[in-house]
Amino acid sequence: MNKLFHTSKVLFATLLLAMIMMTTSCSSEGDFYSKVPEDARFVMSIKAKGLAEKSNAVKKMREIANLVGEQEAKDAADMLETLFGDDSPVDLNNIVMFEYEGNVYAWLMVNDVEMLDKIDAIAENFEKSKKDDFVIYEANENCCIVMNGNGGLMMMGNDADSDDAIKAFMDFDDLESDKAIANNEIFMKNMQGDDDVYLYLDIEGLTSLVGSTAELKKALSREFENEGLSVPDYIDEVMESFVYASASFTKDAATLKMSLLDDKGTNIINKIYGNKTIDKKILSYLDKNSSFVMACSLPEQGKKMIEQALSNSLPEEMKSTASEIVRHLDGNMAFGITVTDSIMAVKEKYDYWSDSYYTTTEPDFTRCGYTFVAKCNTKMDDYLSSLAGYLGMSVTNGVITIPNDEMNITIKSDGDYVVVSNVGTPAQSLAGSDLANDKQLLMYFDCSKNSSISSLINSELPIDLDATTTLTLDKECAMLTIHVGNNKKDNILEYCFDLIIDIAKSK
C-alpha cells in the first residue's frame, strides 16, 4: 500500500495543475472536441467531478492517507480536498485529453489564473514566465502549459517546450470546424452521453507510432498462415477500425462497453461473427452453482483454429478422429467450473533444506467440478466409439469413462451434444438462464454472497464480498459488468474504496 503513493512532487504538481485547469468554460465533451484535430489517434473524456462525488473520494482518500501515513498520500488527499471540497475555487466537469502527432494535449480552462500561484505544489514545482500574450508554466522538458486569458493548453511529450506549445495552442484554437474531430458524426455519437468515462482509439494510427502498419499486418497474416488460417480481410478490417469505449458507475454496478467500428460505423466484430449466437440449450449441461462459466458461438475461423491446434498437438493416429469431430462442431461450446467448500485440503510437504515434512493448507483443484459441452451438427455416437477404441475403452450407454487417480472423467454423446465432465449430470442446471440470450460470447464469475468463492475469500480477508462479474459480446458491443449485491453505499466506487481500506487495515 505504501508504494502506491511514492510519486514525485513534479508528477503530483502536474496532475494538480491539469485537474484544476480542465474546468468551467467547457461544460460538455462537445465543447472540447471542437478544438481537437480530426486525426487525433487517442481521445479520452472523464467526468471528474461526478466520479469524485460518486466515490466519496475526498473522504476516502483522507482515510487511506491516515492509514498509510505517507506524505505522498497526504498530499494526494490535500489535492482532492482542494479540488472537490465545498470551498473549492473551481468547478470540475469534464477532463478531455488527446494525442496528436506523438504528443499528449489537454485543453485547459480556469476562471482565476492567479489562484495557481497560491497553491504550494504548483509554486514549488513549476517555473512561471511570460511570452507575448501567453503565461507559461514549465515543470520540465516533458510538460509545458501555456495560457492565454482563461484558456490554456497542456502539452506532454519528449520535447514539450513553450514555443511548440504556443504554436499548438494557436493551431488548435483556430481549428476550422470541418478539421475538428467534432465534425465526425460517428465519433460524436459514441463519445458523449450519460456515462462517466469515454475513450476513442484509432488502431491504425496508434500502431503507426511504433512502426509500419503494413508490416504489422503482414506479420499477423504470416502468424495466422502458420496456423493454417487465411484471414487477411479480417486483419485489414480490425487494423483499420476504431475503438469506442465508455464506463459508467451506479450504486450496484460498474459497466464497461466497447465497440470496434469502421469509418462508416459498422461493427467489425459483428461482421466477423455474422448472425451466430450462443445455443440456448447448451447451458443446461452446466451446474446452476457454477463458479465460472464460459460459452461462445465460434465463427468458422475459430473452428479452423481449434482443428489446427489439435492437429499440432495430438498423436498421428488420433488426428483424423479429432479432425472429424471438429468438422462436425457447429461452433457452440460451453465450459463450467464449480468450486466447492471442500476445495481447501491439508497436504503434507517435504522441505529439502531442513530434510523434514510439514503440513500446509492449499487449494486442491481436483475437488472442483468441471464440465465442457460442444454442440455438433450431427449425432456423435460413432465418433465417440472410434475415440473409445483408440483409448482401449468401451462405450457403455453412450458414455466413455476414463478412470484417473484423482477424478473420473466421462465423455458422453447426448444427441447433438458432446459432454465431457468429472461430475456427471448436475442436480440443478443453468437451463432457462438468460445469461447467454442473443450473445456471441459469455463469461461469468460468481462471487455472490453465498457462493463458495466468496466464502473462501471472506475466510482469508476481513471483507464482505458480494459480487458477480459478467463479460458478454453481442451484435452491438462487448460489455463487462461488475455487479454488487446489497450495497450499503451510494455507489459501487465507494464500495470498492471500502474494500481497499478494509484489506489495508488487515495487513
Functional labels for PLM-detected ranges:
Residues 26-140, 180-364, 500-507:
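Structural boundary/hinge residues at secondary-structure and domain interfaces
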Residues 90, 328-382, 389-391, 397-408, ...:
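Long compositionally biased, domain-poor regions of proteins
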Residues 2-13:
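Bacterial N-terminal signal peptides that target proteins for export
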Residues 110-149, 363-366, 377-416, 439-463:
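Short Gly/Thr-rich strand-loop-strand
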Residues 44, 137-171, 294, 406-435, ...:
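A short, solvent-exposed beta-edge/loop patch
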Residues 432-507:
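Long, C-terminal catalytic modules of enzymes
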Residues 49, 158-163, 202-208, 261-265, ...:
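Hydrophobic lipid-interacting interfaces of membrane-associated proteins
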Residues 12-23:
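Bacterial N-terminal signal peptides
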